């Protein structure tokens, strides 16, 4: 089952309490997803937003260990990449805190060249960049992007008729 809480101003403590209740009701959780880390609230007395985001990031890391399940946190990127010729995201582009990079076991970025260059020869393709992997290699994976389904699929193998729709 999927359980969604769309409270836009939640804290790590609220997520923790709700996840613990859910775990006690249904058993082990497969995955906790935080859509847009920067929308979360931290403690009121944090010195600045960077410290607040650092505390949120650390709290999510602790939550993953406590629940014994992965926590995926989606993060906004800074606008720094807009000023570079290569728009592929880098770890330093994670917005408002280096702690996100530090706390994460895995950091992945999505990149589509056609977003920045409508005439790109890579139209219909996306790159998943594994920029950090605490216990494995980093790499890039190219996928086909099907915008009418908002879906990513494996690229076609040579000699096939197109992207796999599995």
Each model region followed by its residue ranges:
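C-terminal regions of RecA-like/P-loop NTPase motor modules
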Residues: 3, 9-29, 58-68, 79-166
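Helical hairpin unit composed of two closely spaced alpha helices linked by a short loop
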Residues: 21, 29-74
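Short beta->alpha junction loops/turns
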Residues: 8-9, 49
């Amino acid at each position: 089952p999927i359980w969604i809480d769309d409270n836009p101003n939640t804290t790590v403590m609220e997520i923790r309490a709700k996840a613990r209740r859910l775990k006690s009701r249904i058993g082990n959780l497969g995955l906790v997803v935080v859509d847009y880390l920067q929308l979360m609230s931290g403690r009121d007395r944090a010195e600045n937003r960077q410290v607040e985001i650092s505390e949120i990031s650390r709290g999510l890391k602790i939550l993953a260990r406590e629940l014994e399940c992965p926590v995926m946190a989606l993060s906004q990127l800074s606008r720094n990449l807009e000023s570079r010729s290569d728009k592929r995201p880098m770890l330093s582009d994670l917005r408002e805190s280096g702690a996100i990079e530090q706390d994460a076991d895995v950091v992945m970025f999505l990149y589509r060249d056609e977003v920045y260059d409508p005439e790109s020869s890579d139209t219909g393709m996306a790159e998943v960049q594994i920029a950090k992997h605490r216990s494995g290699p980093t790499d890039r994976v190219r996928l086909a992007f099907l915008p009418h389904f908002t879906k990513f699929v494996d690229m076609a193998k040579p000699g096939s008729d197109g992207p796999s729709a599995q």
